[in-house]
Amino acid sequence: MIEFLMAAGAPKPVAPFSHATACEGWLFVTGQMPTDPADDSAPLPDGIEAQTRRVLDNLKRVLAGIGSALDRVVFARVYLTHFERDYAAMNRVYESYFAPGHLPARTCIGVTGLARGALVEIDLLARRAQD
């Protein structure tokens, strides 16, 4: 059975999608942007470090709201609009959110643009906490 999940406290979706879908213990988490969960119309944070922190904090909110956490993430996909410029700085922030030696598999993709002019977006594949 497939479940369509919304997480309280996470940024509201700005298009027709769920925060995540669940199937047989797997969680497919929609890409999060650096939007303010309290005010999705607020300006985005300045710089890749602040935007990466906001994205990962938003992902933590989504995961907590659907019964998981960052330590249950098995795969991440990162989208960067300025790959060469922002890759190293994004990695420093990204790595700080995971326990040493427990980094999920990951793909990082350079893209020509993201909604609202964001610099970064990240989606995840995770397991539910009870698995």
Model-derived regions: residue spans:
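N-terminal presequence-like segments and the immediate start of the first folded domain
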Residues: M1-D57, R61-V74, L80-D131
